[in-house]
Amino acid sequence: MSLWKKTLYKSVCLALALLVAVTVFQRSVTPGQFLQDPLPPTLGPPKTGSLVNPNSFWKSSKDVVAPTPTVPRGPQVWDVVTTNCSINVNLTHQPWFQNLEPHFRQFLAYQHCRYFPMLLNHPEKCAGDVYLLVVVKSVITQHDRREVIRQTWGHEWESAGPDRGAVRTLFLLGTASKQEERTHYQQLLAYEDRLYGDILQWDFLDSFFNLTLKEIHFLKWLDIYCPNVPFIFKGDDDVFVNPTNLLEFLSDRQPQENLFVGDVLKHARPIRKKDNKYYIPAVMYSKATYPPYAGGGGFLMSGSLARQLHHACDTLELFPIDDVFLGMCLEVLGVKPTGHEGFKTFGISRVRGSRMNKEPCFYRSMLVVHKLLPAELLAMWDLVHSNLTCSLKFQVL
């Protein structure tokens, strides 16, 4: 090779190396923003046919509901592009505020900050005929849970049965809570999203109190991108779900219903013990009881009600417990959540050591069971879908 060709070759190599270095640097400075146009997902071949069990075990009698009021459509794209949120200085000087625990002070000081930019978005998930949207709350570090869900109950289907559309799955995430880990995990998440194309991510920290942000961000996203999806299942990333039973339950439901069904807690009292995860000081909620709400392990709702919820939630101040906050939004609408025995937020049996919590025949009869580790979920899924012989289905446990 001549000298000028060698020089040209070295120059080209150096330019490529610099381009790669600049790209990596930009990704580390603005995590998530570099993936504006992700590659198409590489999902396995979709299953076809009906998921609905021919038996009508989960078809229950339902209350007559009033027609759903028309809800005005909001913006047609996610319209929050910058994070411009400052502390509420007026609040910080109040004596009652200064007496609160640090995490409550943090929550209240930024309570007015409701919406944040999107880092990862997949509006195409609602394109075409979608019957059920499966939405899973997750955190950036829980890749193993998301992977097991994709292999089991979160697997997408092209048909939910005769005359019914597809089943699509999405995961809801914020950003890593630890600053020193954020860039690393964001790059891993970007790769995961390139593989599967099923992650919605917003630019707020994933924390317990920010679960409420995740609720309102999803409701806003749904209102923008999914105006016609009939039903939504929303759950945690540590639950067992039986999609066949979910679809059987929905088979005689109408999208226009104000449907919100799960493991409903009524007359629950605010916890005042400071060492409890769900402790709420009286200054933040002074009433004796919460409105009825569904435990966050998982619940079903109609798309029409979800769009109403988006607007109802915008009329309320944010509350640090997301399940209770949704109950407050339902109360604004005058809608009462419906309890169902197939949703087990606290396990099939509340006694942790009970053998029922490991019995696959019970899981075959349920809709949602909370909670399982990834290995437990995978093992139970295989058992439930094996040549298992169960004497009967259990309606009330």
Curated annotation (Swiss-Prot):
It is a single-pass type II membrane protein. Residues 27-397 are lumenal. Residues 1-6 are cytoplasmic. One of its GO terms (molecular function) is acetylglucosaminyltransferase activity. It is an enzyme of class 2 (transferase). It is found in: Golgi apparatus membrane. Pathway: Protein modification; protein glycosylation. It comes from the Eukaryota. It holds the Pfam family Galactosyl_T. GO terms for biological process: keratan sulfate proteoglycan biosynthetic process; poly-N-acetyllactosamine biosynthetic process; protein O-linked glycosylation. Keywords: Glycoprotein, Glycosyltransferase, Golgi apparatus, Membrane, Signal-anchor, Transferase, Transmembrane, Transmembrane helix. Glycans are attached at residues 84, 90, 210, 387. Disulfide bonds: none annotated. Its EC number is 2.4.1.-. N-acetyl glucosamine (GlcNAc) transferase that catalyzes the transfer of GlcNAc via a beta1->3 linkage from UDP-GlcNAc to the non-reducing terminal galactose (Gal) in the linearly growing chain of N- and O-linked keratan sulfate proteoglycans. Cooperates with B4GALT4 galactosyltransferase and CHST6 and CHST1 sulfotransferases to construct and elongate mono- and disulfated disaccharide units [->3Galbeta1->4(6-sulfoGlcNAcbeta)1->] and [->3(6-sulfoGalbeta)1->4(6-sulfoGlcNAcbeta)1->] within keratan sulfate polymer. Belongs to the glycosyltransferase 31 family. PANTHER family: BETA-1,3-N-ACETYLGLUCOSAMINYLTRANSFERASE, UDP-GLCNAC:BETAGAL BETA-1,3-N-ACETYLGLUCOSAMINYLTRANSFERASE 7. This is UDP-GlcNAc:betaGal beta-1,3-N-acetylglucosaminyltransferase 7. The gene is B3gnt7.
